[in-house]
């Protein structure tokens, strides 16, 4: 590979670093992208760490001291990478800025003459318990509004009470606040029934998944399966077996027939008879209808029989009977960032579009609103990167370490955003996606960062508060490897660890 642009600087060691890194981490054919700079000690330390790892991948790094805005390390910082879930950093900051921290999501139930309406508001964390509470409210309301029939019999007025709930023929589902496109641009077609690939709908419950509780049965017999919710919306074929030894042991699989877009699940494989109960989450096809079916079943247990569940807009004359409002969006963002929830990310993007443009929320208008914010407020040149979804699942996303450092620096310097934004991050060695990474015995050190993982992609961006109290923003993006991600995560952790003790 020929490099036509020579590295600047008088230090011969920097030239060595550049030649070494070009050899080890060939990131692009564009020669202008190869650029390394920073403090000599940091350059030495990180170069040694990278060399000792023996790993080969496309790599971009940038580290900035936030109080001085000084770059203390940079390698290939303007090159574009698929950021995976580091994309959620854009979504999180935009949600705080555009929706404001007190914004809530509403799910409502209405009634007209012969129908109930369940209206979704894009709540990413609506639970089965909250839906059941609304069903109980509807049941109680119906009992307070009983109808009465009067007639004459033997010259006396007779009266009987009629439960009007029994006359309800339809439960109508309105998810029209957002469009009905279930998958993001650039999502892989074969993600299947995994939790992280749940379809997107304005009417979502239980993360658009069914929980499967798996317990060993009698040896030689199928394992015991319970689900939450218990619903006729799905069917289960249980071909599994409880075993007492590991000979010919087959891993348990719970698979939905997603190719045919059904909600038929097949369970195969083995469970040891000594195993504890385990929980599996699998997504469903058509989450709007799933939510409606489960709600109708909840109503039925309370004596309200629904004959048909269909999708249609809310009738203008319908009367609101019940409403659930979510916690403020800043609470949703903490759970979203720490658990890296893809469904929440995409619902936020579409909801931002609906709020910003006062129309049906879509990926197009939501992402446009976010990019306008990033360009006009954060100062990112949105012509230099590609934002295709809110979660980072899309293979069309491209960002650089430079983009993330601008974002992280702006958020840190914004007095309104900073504390709320920083509180959403996983904490190194403490919780969620970083609970077993970057453990540091020095209590003065704090590392908060967002991970990003796809096949061949491992990224880490966030903040370091060093032993001296210096705040750093960093972004490490890695693309283009074919083996497991763990060695590359370990390399990221070593780089971050070296940065915690730097003396500027």
Where are these regions (language model features)?
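Small-residue-rich helix-loop
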Residues: 72-74, 324, 349-504
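Short active-site loop at a secondary-structure junction
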Residues: 74-94, 98
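Conserved serine DD-peptidase/penicillin-binding transpeptidase domain
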Residues: 49, 98-382, 498-504
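Beta-lactamase-like hydrolase cores
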Residues: 30-79, 99-102, 137-154
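N-terminal secretory signal peptides that target proteins for export/translocation
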Residues: 1-11
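C-terminal motif of bacterial Sec signal peptides marking the signal peptidase cleavage site
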Residues: 25-26
